[in-house]
Regions:
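NTP/phosphate- and nucleic-acid-binding module
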Residues: 1-221
């Protein structure tokens, strides 16, 4: 989401005049930013007048966009440490003030934005960099072989969500699409005959067959 996230001038609340928010373009977001054409300036609507004056930017050069906040920075300077009489000694033994700041990231907010931005009509489409698992392994009446593959993959350091429930293939496929793990491996009775598993990326429509012995190398980079 980095390419669609702005460092934004925003209200500092009770702490400072301004803060820096990290705002991601998201139609489900609750904030409105005003952004210039080359995306070098982004101002939260709540401080639009004060911030444009501070930055020397004309409001007419900014356009609104709906966003969701995923993180923030409050810079306190030395105000807080001065009140607490907190200092440090430098290399020359002189007392120096300590600069304080608060750096926050909203983990649940980030997840919500990912859900909004990386999904389709079937469900989630987790980006590989943040997916909770690399592989969704489905057993369709071939539990013994599927369990063997699960153990082989996990021993190789590959994160696997294993579904060995007694459900129909259609139900398992639908739930797999809903969860959106980057890659799905299906092991069924046909797999036992061919010695190959069915492998399908969540972002692609077609599946391919991969030999059991080649599955580990498929996920090693």
């Amino acid at each position: 989401i980095g390419d669609e996230t702005y460092v934004t001038f925003a209200s500092g609340g009770a702490f400072t005049k301004f803060s820096h928010e990290f705002q991601t373009i998201c139609t489900a977001g609750e904030d409105v930013l005003y952004v210039n054409a080359d995306r070098t300036v982004a101002v939260n609507e709540e401080v639009l007048d004060d911030a444009t004056q501070e930055l020397g930017v004309a409001k007419k050069t900014l356009s609104p966009v709906t966003t969701a906040e995923v993180g923030n920075i409050f810079k306190f300077g030395t105000e807080k440490s001065d009140k607490m009489h907190v200092v440090y000694k430098d290399a020359e033994g002189k007392q120096q003030p300590i600069y304080l700041a608060s750096y926050g990231i909203g983990i649940t907010r980030v997840m919500g934005v990912i859900v909004e931005k990386f999904s389709d009509e079937k469900g989630l489409v987790w980006p590989e960099a943040v997916a909770p698992f690399q592989v969704h392994l489905l057993s369709l009446g071939a539990d013994e072989k599927a369990t063997e593959i699960y153990e082989t993959l996990t021993k190789a350091g590959i994160e696997v969500l294993y579904d060995d429930r007694d459900l129909s293939a259609g139900a398992k496929f639908a739930e797999s699409d809903l969860l959106g793990i980057p890659c799905r491996i299906v092991v069924g009775k046909r797999s036992l005959e061919s010695g190959k598993a069915e492998v399908k990326k969540r972002t692609e429509g077609d599946a391919t067959e991969v030999a059991f012995d080649d599955l580990v190398s498929l996920f090693r980079k």
